């Protein structure tokens, strides 16, 4: 299994419950696809350097997980079609 890291920007106008629901959705998706969640780190609301989809702020969260490439691909696919996600980046961590 490979290690991956995803940084996700969520719409800033969500309620706390809805935000937690979005995070849980992706945290639960990883094991469903045969992966393993290593760490979830909520960074909170931060100001963006430039507007993204007409938003100047976003909630950030970091998701570290292990899995096959298909797990990362499915996570990216679901993030692309989610209206609550304004930007994301999934990268494979280097082996050390």
Swiss-Prot record:
- Superkingdom, according to UniProt? Bacteria
Which Pfam families did the record assign?
Ribosomal_S6 (PF01250)
Quote the cellular component terms of the Gene Ontology held in the record: cytoplasm; ribonucleoprotein complex; ribosome
Which example biological process does GO assign this protein? translation
Q: Which UniProt keywords apply?
A: Ribonucleoprotein, Ribosomal protein, RNA-binding, rRNA-binding
Q: Which family does it belong to?
A: Belongs to the bacterial ribosomal protein bS6 family.
NCBIfam families on file? S6
Q: Which PANTHER family match?
A: MITOCHONDRIAL 28S RIBOSOMAL PROTEIN S6 (PTHR21011), SMALL RIBOSOMAL SUBUNIT PROTEIN BS6M (PTHR21011:SF1)
The protein in question is named Small ribosomal subunit protein bS6
Give the species.
Heliobacterium modesticaldum (strain ATCC 51547 / Ice1)
């Amino acid at each position: 299994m490979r290690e991956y890291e995803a940084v996700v920007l969520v719409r800033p106008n969500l309620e706390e419950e809805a935000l937690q629901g979005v995070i849980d959705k992706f945290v639960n998706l990883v094991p469903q696809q045969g992966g393993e969640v290593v760490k979830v780190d909520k960074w909170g609301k931060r100001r963006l350097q430039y507007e993204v989809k007409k938003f100047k702020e976003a909630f950030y969260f970091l998701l570290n997980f292990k899995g096959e490439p298909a797990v990362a691909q499915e996570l990216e696919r679901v993030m692309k079609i989610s209206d609550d996600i304004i930007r994301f980046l999934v990268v494979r961590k280097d082996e050390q």
